[in-house]
């Protein structure tokens, strides 16, 4: 990785720390959001990318299968990530489908939807308390 960082290709930028206000713009510019990490819980970066409708590619972790319900492109290793990126370059319509899946993640974790879930939960608990 040091070799790539020291001499990145022209289409790869390492911006360092980015101001939060600028992140939405950068996510919106992204052709693909790729998070290759092995050890994540539930990174906010996924929700941020989804809220900007950036297509999402992640490592194939069990956690993501449960919380994102297939609304992303799972990959097992760097080679599969590379193949998927090349596939999207050749077939941009598949990338559009992935963008639609990002919208589904954004809806699922929107303030409005989460508020509905919590209100339902508290109403159910209040009803149980009255019995």
Which residue ranges define each predicted feature?
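Nucleotide-activated donor-binding/catalytic signature segment of Leloir-type glycosyltransferases, i.e.
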Residues: 1-18
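A short hydrophobic beta-strand element within the catalytic core of glycosyltransferases
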Residues: 33-34
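Short hydrophobic beta-strand element within catalytic cores of glycosyltransferases
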Residues: 55-58
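A short, well-ordered alpha-helix in the C-terminal region of glycosyltransferases
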Residues: 94-108
């Amino acid at each position: 990785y040091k070799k790539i960082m020291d001499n990145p290709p022209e289409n790869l930028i390492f911006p360092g720390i980015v101001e939060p206000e600028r992140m939405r713009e950068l996510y919106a510019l992204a052709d693909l959001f790729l998070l290759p990490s092995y050890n994540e819980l539930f990174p906010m970066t996924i929700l941020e990318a989804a809220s900007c409708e950036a297509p999402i590619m992640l490592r194939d972790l069990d956690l993501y299968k449960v919380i994102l319900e297939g609304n992303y492109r799972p990959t097992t290793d760097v080679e599969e990530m590379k193949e998927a990126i090349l596939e999207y370059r050749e077939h941009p319509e598949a990338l559009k489908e992935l963008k639609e899946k990002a919208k589904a993640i954004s809806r699922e974790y929107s303030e409005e939807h989460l508020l509905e879930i919590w209100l339902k939960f508290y109403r159910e608990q209040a009803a149980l308390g009255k019995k």
